[in-house]
Regions:
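Alpha-helical transmembrane segments and their immediate juxtamembrane cytosolic regions
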Residues: 1-333
Length: 333
């Protein structure tokens, strides 16, 4: 039964369809980017970072995480967050999805695929998102910004006194050590939920916008581009004119997975989830999967840029984005 204030007109149905196609297309871009990073080498034969990694490393995974937040927002009311029993039902559904993701992720972790399985991390991320499902963008955007700025600092402080991660995938047997499992999922692992909370909050905030409107898509495109460029530029200034690179070269990377790599290559490939703890200057990098404030803000910006571009393309060239949307609609999250 439709109330007079929510009549489904042809225009609103078309707007909703465009929105969903654009979101699915952006998810397709993320999936292709993640597959490209897994398939192609990080370093080219000449010793430089490969083009695939320069473009997609870190950015595609961040896009996927932001879109997970967008999906949760759309499932819980879109621009109008649900209230009362409807909100409670959305929260319960999200917890159920989190459980499924966690169980499937633990089972997949038993296979020696050579890939970092993200599903268990996503399960915990969805649990983290539950208390925020009733909020609107005016609160969610500042919360996402605070998470991006503060959680890397908290992570850097915590990890100075924590054991190094296993760099293995969580498996069912990991449940026998719940404290160790939680610390790796939340702080030290490949996709640490502490810092990745910025992505899910940013996605929730974006999903609360009127994504079917052209001005929203344009705002995401332009705002994302500005955020990505600005954070990259500030990081460059800190690392170069301000002397950050020299400090990092002197401090070294300790037992981090990037140890032994030339610094310029390490900064453009992958940090495997966290920064080294040998210097606080590591928080100034914008390196893929470093979880620094600049990495989080830069990749949130690129995610918004891609989503805005796909939403606009869905308006003017719907057939062109259908292949990407078809790919994106098949993802598990």
């Amino acid at each position: 039964m439709t109330t007079p204030g929510h009549v489904a007109t042809p225009d609103t149905r078309l707007s909703s369809a465009r929105r969903l196609i654009g979101v699915d297309a952006a998810r397709g871009v993320a999936l292709i980017g993640m597959m490209s990073v897994h398939i192609n080498p990080a370093v080219a034969p000449d010793g430089d970072t490969s083009t695939t990694y320069l473009i997609a490393s870190g950015r595609s995974a961040a896009l996927f995480a932001v879109l997970a937040g967008v999906g949760l927002a759309l499932a819980s009311g879109g621009p109008t967050p649900r209230r009362g029993r409807a909100l409670a039902a959305a929260m319960a559904a999200t917890l159920a999805r989190a459980t499924v993701l966690g169980v499937v992720g633990l089972l997949l972790g038993a296979f020696d695929s050579g890939l970092a399985i993200i599903l268990v991390y996503y399960g915990l991320l969805f649990v983290v998102a539950v208390p925020f499902l009733g909020l609107g963008p005016r609160l969610l955007f500042p919360l996402a910004a605070m998470a991006a700025a503060l959680t890397p600092v908290i992570s850097q402080w915590l990890r100075q006194s924590m054991p190094p991660p296993s760099y293995g995938n969580p498996v069912v047997e990991s449940l026998a050590d719940p404290v160790g499992l939680f610390s790796e999922l939340a702080v030290t692992g490949y996709y640490p939920v502490l810092t990745w909370s910025a992505y899910i909050l940013a996605g929730l905030a974006v999903g609360r916008l009127a994504l079917g409107e052209a001005k929203t898509a344009t705002g995401l495109l332009l705002g994302g581009a500005v955020l990505a460029a600005a954070t990259w530029a500030v990081s460059w200034l800190l690392l170069n004119p301000a002397g950050g690179l020299e400090t990092l070269a002197a401090a070294g990377s300790g037992s981090s997975p990037i140890a032994g790599r030339p610094l310029d290559v390490a900064l453009t490939t992958s940090f495997y989830g966290t920064t080294p703890t040998t210097s606080w200057w590591w928080l100034a990098v914008v390196a893929p999967h470093s979880g620094s404030p600049f990495d989080l803000l830069h990749t949130i910006g690129t995610a918004c840029f891609v989503l805005g571009a796909m939403l606009l393309l869905a308006r003017v060239a719907r057939a062109a984005v259908w292949p990407l949307a078809a790919i994106g609609s098949m993802t598990f999250t």
